[in-house]
Amino acid sequence: MDPVPDLPESQGSFQELWETVSYPPLETLSLPTVNEPTGSWVATGDMFLLDQDLSGTFDDKIFDIPIEPVPTNEVNPPPTTVPVTTDYPGSYELELRFQKSGTAKSVTSTYSETLNKLYCQLAKTSPIEVRVSKEPPKGAILRATAVYKKTEHVADVVRRCPHHQNEDSVEHRSHLIRVEGSQLAQYFEDPYTKRQSVTVPYEPPQPGSEMTTILLSYMCNSSCMGGMNRRPILTILTLETEGLVLGRRCFEVRICACPGRDRKTEEESRQKTQPKKRKVTPNTSSSKRKKSHSSGEEEDNREVFHFEVYGRERYEFLKKINDGLELLEKESKSKNKDSGMVPSSGKKLKSN
């Protein structure tokens, strides 16, 4: 083998090396014959083409690779909406009923019809009866969702507090509402709003009953820091089929240590704040009334007004003022009556 000559480091060195390389002429190359199974070669100018139909062996769709859509900022998620909290019985006349358990301190769950509010203990079962006027479509479900009641909190997602979440080991430990007594319960979290809900298939009532009972439990107290933090919540119970809402009912929920006591306290507070209903005589137009000035003053004095007072001390103070004014009015009327007594002789009677 001849030694490689030392070439100068320049642009022309590669050209000189390439010219020294020898290769056989094209005529000496062996090409496939016509009888070979691979096909025949046909000379066309300076090119050799294989004269064979490859349609049976060549997949012409090999380059038809589906193009996956690339996510861009122009693709927006579906719009989020504020949950509806108004009742909607729908064509199936959805109704909810709660067991009557009173306000005893020993009850674990009680419902106030006056306040449309459920009071229950932490992780205690609350039976809720569901009634419809006709059989829903096959595959219908009942969905329970918790939302905050007040407008300033409605955008926040209702979740359990970190303390109670860490004590639990189930996959849906962040969910506030759970369905008990059913292996078919499913827990969901909306990918856009992050709101959580639990569903259970609708089951027709048992023979001899008009109601279907579901068992709900609430896994966090209303006063838990880092969770509800004393913010009132609502439970939205919907009857759905394939994403379509057939009916909706809402009620407020308070999770506390003593449901009976809290229900009694809030109902009494509601009664105190509501003014007593009085019969009001319709008044005619003043232009049509022909009364004396004195009779008009008497009518004004008989008119009753109501206003709310906060605080027992302030109420007692205003009550004393009102009692004093009524006493002065009574004494004034008594004096006017005595001074107005005149005998038949025209002489004024002396008052004792």
Curated annotation (Swiss-Prot):
Zn(2+) binds at C161, H164, C220, C224. Its cofactor is Zn(2+). A motif (Bipartite nuclear localization signal) lies at residues 276-291. It comes from Oryzias latipes (Japanese rice fish). Residues 1-48 are annotated as: Transcription activation (acidic). This is Cellular tumor antigen p53. GO terms for biological process: apoptotic process; DNA damage response; positive regulation of transcription by RNA polymerase II; protein tetramerization; regulation of transcription by RNA polymerase II. Belongs to the p53 family. Residues 262-303, 330-352 are annotated as: Disordered. The keyword Oxidoreductase does not apply. The N-terminal and C-terminal disordered regions undergo liquid-liquid phase separation (LLPS) following homotetramerization and activation. Post-translational modifications, such as phosphorylation or lactylation affect the ability to undergo LLPS. Residues 334-350 are annotated as: Basic (repression of DNA-binding). Residues 302-331 are annotated as: Oligomerization. Residues 254-261 are annotated as: Interaction with DNA.
